[in-house]
């Protein structure tokens, strides 16, 4: 996910985003490191994740070898 889009979602009333297929809420974004602090919707756990792991849908494209 783009850092500016992630920052927009912090202040929006948009639905959840997904980190590794799990619904999360973005709490903060560090644009310089391209990392975000997210909170799990399921259990409330907070973690730091790369913006590349955050999607606006729960579907992650898998590549088969």
UniProtKB/Swiss-Prot annotation:
It comes from the Bacteria. Keywords: Sporulation. One of its GO terms (cellular component) is endospore-forming forespore. Its main location: other. This is Small, acid-soluble spore protein H 1. Belongs to the SspH family. It is found in: Spore core. HAMAP family: SspH. One of its GO terms (biological process) is sporulation resulting in formation of a cellular spore. It comes from Clostridium botulinum (strain Langeland / NCTC 10281 / Type F). The lineage of its organism: Bacteria, Bacillati, Bacillota, Clostridia, Eubacteriales. The keyword Transcription regulation does not apply.
